[in-house]
Amino acid sequence: MRFISIFLIIVALCVSSSWAFNFTDQPNSFRISGTGCGSGTTTVYFSTDGRCNSACGGSIRIKGEGNNVPNQQFTLNDYSKNVTNCSGTSNVASFRCPALVNTTSPTFTVNVGNSAYHVTCQYAQVTETPAGNSADKVAVGIAIIFGALISLLAL
């Protein structure tokens, strides 16, 4: 009986730590791609300092607007070295999200200059940790872990 109790406590520890700290998260990166210069929604959008093709030679700013997105701006300087074609017909880039952005959201339509792109990236909520987990979720997970450890010592 004691062995079963210890086994169940260890299982609870593993499950709660995985749930609290989300060990199975994918890397916080994404890809954007598109063709030509089109249009799209601006709930979350990328903008450049000039026309559509200026992204090839410069940096990109990611800026969030709307009710659910903080009005903050980040500069992603590594975009230009990942562009495969600067003619505006087939620009593809991959880069890491800023610290306050995670990849758990649905795909948004965004603009890079005047080009329409899709990206799987969103701003994290204020209460989220850099890993994208809420502070409450992490606190509850830690409490479960400590409770299980105390139970192990009591056996």
Swiss-Prot record:
The GPI-like-anchor contains a phosphoceramide group, rather than a phosphatidyl group. It is found in: Cell membrane. A lipid is attached at N133 (GPI-like-anchor amidated asparagine). The keyword Cell division does not apply. GO terms for cellular component: cell surface; plasma membrane; side of membrane. Transmembrane segments: none annotated. Residues 1-20 form the signal peptide. Keywords: Cell membrane, Glycoprotein, GPI-anchor, Lipoprotein, Membrane, Signal. Glycans are attached at N22, N82, N85, N102, S105. It comes from the Eukaryota. Coiled coil: none annotated. Residues 134-155 form a propeptide. It is a lipid-anchor; GPI-anchor. This is Prespore-specific protein E.
